[in-house]
A protein has these predicted regions:
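Mid/C-terminal beta-alpha module of Rossmann-like enzyme folds, strongest
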Residues: 247-303, 348
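Conserved Rossmann-fold NAD(P)-dependent oxidoreductase catalytic core, especially the SDR/UDP-sugar
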Residues: 99-122, 126-179
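NAD(P)H-binding glycine-rich loop region in Rossmannoid oxidoreductase-like domains
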Residues: 42-102, 111-116, 120, 125-132, ...
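Catalytic helix-loop patch of NAD(P)-dependent Rossmann-fold dehydrogenases
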Residues: 164-204
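NAD(P)-dependent short-chain dehydrogenase/reductase
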Residues: 192-236
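Amphipathic terminal alpha-helices
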Residues: 329-348
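Glycine/proline-rich active-site loop of Rossmann-fold NAD(P)-dependent oxidoreductases
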Residues: 185, 197-198, 210-222, 250-261, ...
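Conserved C-terminal active-site "lid" loop/helix of NAD(P)H-dependent oxidoreductases
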Residues: 296-325
């Protein structure tokens, strides 16, 4: 009885539980039968915050493999939201996570250990039964214990590089144009190889620019950072943070092994237009416009890197395969819910 009760409550491990991860926690907690949520954090000071949100914190650092020993066999669903290190050609963090998840789990104590032992006894008994009875006994073992774990990886649409404003679906070959995107491609390939070995069932979600009330370019507008003139401007793609959390969970539930899905809304606008719409909604001045040549002289390399890539993501898989309904189909839909005299107007 104890084993059945425990095995019926699945565990979800969130690796990299920042803003989007916390939104995933909130959405999981709202389910009629919420899972047990475990959050890996490298910051001991965040334990109280995670507990208050409804997650069990585990302190560990993807840059220190020795701190990850508890992850082996811990959960059947993993949300991998941690970014790569800010340097290097590959993603050592994803490599460390795959190794930790595939390690033999430490002996469980208490009810969890009893559950594992109960399943083991059931399997041992089934091995001595006639074929028909053995098959029926095997079906009693929860399906999650017979399949590899599911891992949903939060990647980036930056892996495509510059596409000249073309419409891009998930079948387009990756052509990363900067070191950040190269590291993301490394992570995706590591997860695909792990999937081919049967170590896990990876679903890859490629994410564009994330926005929310607390993630808008307000500081950029107040600094007066310029945008490109329309003739030189690039198409950008967007997703609200709440929708993104929902998409990650939908990928876990309905996604296909090894499949890529774009987490992008229906917005079709250039970068400068995005800044102008946020400026109007928040009661701030529109950014000045400059040519690309002027931008190359005046802006920082990181800012320029985003201005060198133009693409329009196709989100057909999101709607057809994941059957996901966007809460905010476009940036404009979100901005219409706020005004300059409400929360946006007070942001700094």
């Amino acid at each position: 009885m104890i084993a059945t009760r425990i095995l019926r409550r699945p565990r979800v491990l969130i690796v990299g539980c920042g803003d989007v991860g916390m939104r995933c926690v909130e959405q999981l907690r709202r389910r009629a039968r919420p899972p047990r949520i475990i959050a890996l954090t490298s910051q001991p000071a965040r334990r109280a915050e995670l507990l208050a949100a409804g997650a069990v914190p585990i302190v560990g650092d993807l840059d220190r493999r020795g701190t990850l020993a508890r992850l082996g066999g811990l959960a059947r669903l993993v949300l991998h939201l941690a970014p790569p290190r800010p340097s290097g050609d590959g993603d050592a963090r994803t490599r460390a996570l795959i190794a930790a998840l595939g390690a033999r789990p430490a002996a469980r104590r208490g009810p969890a250990r009893q559950a594992t032992q109960a399943v083991g006894r059931l399997r041992a008994t089934a091995s001595h039964l006639p074929d028909g009875q053995a098959n029926r006994a095997a079906r009693i073992v929860p399906e999650g214990l017979r399949r590899p774990m599911t891992l949903v990886y939060a990647s980036t649409s930056g892996v495509y590089g510059d596409c000249g404003g073309a419409y891009v679906d998930e079948t387009r070959p990756v052509r990363p144009a900067n070191a950040r995107a190269v590291r993301r491609v490394s992570a995706e390939r590591q997860l695909r190889r792990a999937g081919a070995r049967g170590a896990l069932d990876a679903r890859i979600v490629r994410i564009p620019g994330i926005y929310a009330a607390n993630r808008l370019p307000i500081a950029r507008l107040e600094r007066g950072t310029p945008a490109l003139v329309d003739a030189d401007d690039v198409y950008t793609n967007h997703i609200h943070a709440d929708d993104l959390a929902g998409i990650l969970l939908a990928a876990a539930r309905r996604g296909r092994a090894g499949r890529v899905v774009h987490a992008s809304d229906d917005t079709e606008m250039k970068m400068g237009e995005y800044f102008e719409r946020v400026a109007r909604a928040s009661g701030r001045a529109s950014p000045p416009r400059i040519t690309r040549d002027e931008a190359e002289q005046r802006l920082e390399p990181v800012q320029l890197s985003f201005m060198r890539e133009s693409r329009r993501l196709v989100n057909t898989r999101l709607k057809r395969e994941l059957r996901f309904v966007l809460r905010y189909p476009s940036v404009e839909d979100f901005l219409r819910t706020v005004s300059a005299d409400s929360e946006l107007g007070s942001l700094r």
